[in-house]
Amino acid sequence: FFNMDTNDSHCTSLETNSSVALNFGGSPGSSDNMFLYDDSSMSDGSLYASDQENLSTPRKRSEYRRHHKRRLRCPQQQIQQRQAANLRERRRMQSINDAFEGLRAHIPTLPYEKRLSKVRVDRNAPDTMLSGVTNSQKLSHEQKKIIHKMPIKILLARQILDTTGIPTVEVDMVTELGLFRVGVPSTDVKKIAEAVQLRDNKPSEFAGKGVNNAVKNINTIIGPELIKQNLEVTMQKEIDQFMIALDGTENKSRLGANAIMCVSLVVAKAGAAKKGMPLYRHISDLAGVASIILPVPHITVIVGGVLSSNGLPFQEYMIMPTGASNFANAMRIGSEIYHYVKNSVSAKYGAQTSFVSHTGGMSIPLESHRDALMLLTDAIKQCGYIGKAEISINASATDLFKDGGYDLEFKNPNSNPQNYMSSDKLAEIYLDNMKEYPVCSIEDAFDFDDWAAWSTLTARTTNQILGNDLTQTNVRRVGLAVEKKAGNAIALRLNQSGTLTELIESYKLLQSNGFGVCVCDRWGDTDDLFIADLVVGLSAGQVKCGGPVRGERVGKYNQIMRIEEELGALAKYAGKNYRERPAGGKMHAKIWVPEDPRFLPRWPYADWSFNCI
């Protein structure tokens, strides 16, 4: 952990049990030798044995001090105690190093050392610089800047369960400020462009969905190698760059995006504590956001598609309280509409019909897409929120796409291919819904590779066309969506990008090109609240955490309300302007338009040079 020069006069080794004579020469008052003893034979303050009595109560201690005046220590005694304390600290740190030797022994030497050699860290590493420094040499100003106490002491990962019962990764990080913990969301749905979540693929354990390999990669590779670099936890970009280079693959398939992202997020938490500020403020600094905007929530009320066995083709029907006065009021509007729908359905179909899905929405036995829209529209009216609440639809059209068409009866194994819809016909359904009902946003309107349909629908409406599966938080696909004007807003998910830095770069790219941003949850979420601070820190304008039920969903909404309370008069709710860029600061982002994403380097990381300073 420390590179301590044993030749330094302030770090004199005291490894023997015999007394060691030290001549302090010009010590005031005496030139006699003094003797230092190994601390194994004494405890703190053992020079004064009478001070070590068991004074268990304040009264006893007070009486003792009154009758036993403490003797003043001479300079030699002060030096002696400092030397003993220094020895104890060195031994304590050595014991921690020894504890990690077992983990370091399992690091694959050949592939990872080769990969690390490509990352230019050796010339700035404190160990390298200090190894050649003697007592007579002085460190340069740049070298002094990076010599600091090791910020990361312990990095420990474990396998936990997400809210669907599927294993995911959790990481503990210990610094001088304490313990920080993050659990990343997971999913068993494989997308072609998102970073790879590493699974064990052992049928005998969790049906092959265990994450012990990802946990092992953190405990034996990422953790020890990251600790060696002696990087401050506030150096988010440098740490993320290091882990990307350590993995060495484009989609993070070697170490696992679930492993890398978990470490990236826990570093952000520790970095916020190091800077003495809330997590959302730290994220604002990382993203260059000057003013804080609280998001409009997409509150899931009804589910269909693959989330339900009902007849609804689209996956989610949500409420957006765009006319609310603040975020707390928005949650009140969403919750009241949710429970009105629940009570209405229970009265009509029975209480068992309001089954709650993984996302917190209700699986209501409706057979028509229009039935769901009519039910929500009536709920908005009956609750008195006309003009204050609008409807958002997550079509998840990739699930409907078959043989070049869209099958709205895809749940029926005997559906007729002649009834498959073209992109144009499906677009007409969306446009009609926007005219007849208060629908303001369509998410994943088409298949993620149906670029022409995305661009056409975006040009035909001013309402929000939100891409989620379209880009999968992949920087290349985000750039392609910007170039083709496919949609006017993009969803960002934590575990799809791989690192917090990559997610922030995607956000900057979208904002600089006038796209809206929605920070989204996943089915297999955890009780971690990071997403709440993320959406506030980015001033994204929109957040999607599911329904106003289930602990992992409500916890995130509650955290945003706490942040709003903390901000007080400075809190600004996005409202109708949920797609607009936050005012008050520049979004320093490159406008990147790829010619052919298959043959381009991984922007913006192709020319990264790792620098500790």
Kindly label every feature range from the protein language model.
Residues 353, 363, 370-592:
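Catalytic core of soluble alpha/beta enzymes
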Residues 191, 288, 292-360:
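Mobile "lid/hinge" segments at catalytic clefts and subdomain interfaces of large enzymes
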Residues 185-277, 286, 331, 361:
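Metal- or metallocofactor-binding catalytic centers and their adjacent structured scaffolds
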Residues 1-79, 130-142:
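Intrinsically disordered, low-complexity transcriptional effector regions
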Residues 60-132:
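Basic DNA-binding helix
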Residues 169-177, 182-186, 299-321, 378-380, ...:
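Short beta-strand elements
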Residues 146-168:
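Short, Gly/Pro- and small/polar-rich lid/capping loops
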